[in-house]
Amino acid sequence: MIKAFLIERRSWIAAFLFQQALMLFIAFVDPSISFGNVLYMVYLCILFFIIFLWFRYRKETAFYKSLKTWENNLDVTAINEPETPFEAMVERSIAGQTEHLKQTAARHRLALENEKDELMAWIHEVKTPLTAMHLIIDRMEEKALKSQLSYEWLRIHLLLDQQLHQKRISFIENDLSVEFIQLQPLIFKEIKDLQSWCIQKGIGFDIQLEAKEVLSDAKWLAFIIRQLLTNAVKYSEASEIEIKSFQKGEQTQLQVKDCGRGIDPKDVPRIFDKGFTSTTDHHDQASTGMGLYLAKKAAAPLLIHIDVESEFGAGTVFTLTFPIRNQFEHVISV
């Protein structure tokens, strides 16, 4: 800040130094003027000027120091009161811009809330004809057509479910209900929902649940597992998907292993990025690049750590590591 102040006042300093140099020059060329007396006077003036500069630095920079340390949280009360007309102009400008930003942010927030509410209402409305469609498909007797329609229905259902959770995920902390959850019924339900797709692709499941329960939120854990299972089914053909749970130290781990196409090593660091699909199968129009991104985002407030190991062309293993009980103390009282 001192450097900035000196740069700002460099014209004043230059004018003062020029004036002192001029006085010394006149005393030097004019024998009638005592050079020693003038030199002493210049010394006193410089000393006084330095003290004056220091005083002005303390006074004039207090306001701007508060601006520099301002956290940009739109709270203008954190800024020091202006003491000069120019500081008052700056303060009024900042206050005006801040108020404008607050109003703009409020309008955008309201618009986003309305958009979210409308979209969620639309999704819930669409679920009614989807349910009716599912009942109609179940009554069909032609197996080939029934299988194809069931698959397309499932795709629509999963996309709507993903969209619904995407809109809710911003407020996930308000929606958590952490409790001990039995893994078997939760996993079996998710597999049952994918049954028609799995039959169509010839995919089975090998389930070994040594650890029977985990501490989490049932709805959001089901969503995370759903994303991992749909990925495993999507990229596998005529194979088994292994689902295992076990204890590792004090923590419970759940693994979902498929024998699908695997992930290219250069893609592994990016698979949880929003919108990322693949660099090897970039033409894949069915992939949205949102499933794993949302799974990772939902896992964070649940303190679930997701690891991935993959061998390109051989398969992928996703591992969910669940927190121990006391790790949830800062999230919710269990």
Curated annotation (Swiss-Prot):
Task: Tell me where on the tree of life, at the top rank, the source sits.
Answer: Bacteria
The residues exposed to the Extracellular compartment are 34
Q: What is its EC number?
A: 2.7.13.3
Pfam assignment, any one: HATPase_c
Its GO CC terms are:
plasma membrane
Where does the chain cross the membrane? 13-33, 35-55
Tell me where in this chain the Histidine kinase domain is found.
121-326
Q: According to its UniProt record, where is this protein located?
A: Cell membrane
As given in the record, the signal peptide range reads none
Per UniProt, the enzyme's principal EC class comes to: transferase
Catalyzed reactions:
ATP + protein L-histidine = ADP + protein N-phospho-L-histidine
Choose any GO biological process term that the UniProt entry carries and state it.
Answer: phosphorelay signal transduction system
How this chain sits in the membrane, per its record, is:
Multi-pass membrane protein
Keyword annotations for this protein, in alphabetical order, are: ATP-binding, Cell membrane, Kinase, Membrane, Nucleotide-binding, Phosphoprotein, Transferase, Transmembrane, Transmembrane helix, Two-component regulatory system
Molecular function as annotated in GO: ATP binding; protein histidine kinase activity
List every position bearing Phosphohistidine: 124
Q: Which parts of the sequence lie on the Cytoplasmic side of the lipid bilayer?
A: 1-12, 56-334
Q: What does this protein do?
A: Member of the two-component regulatory system BceS/BceR involved in the regulation of bacitracin resistance. Activates BceR in response to extracellular bacitracin.
By its UniProt entry, which PANTHER family does this protein fall under? HISTIDINE KINASE, PHOSPHATE REGULON SENSOR PROTEIN PHOR
Q: What is this protein called?
A: Sensor protein BceS
User: What gene, per UniProt, encodes this protein?
Assistant: bceS
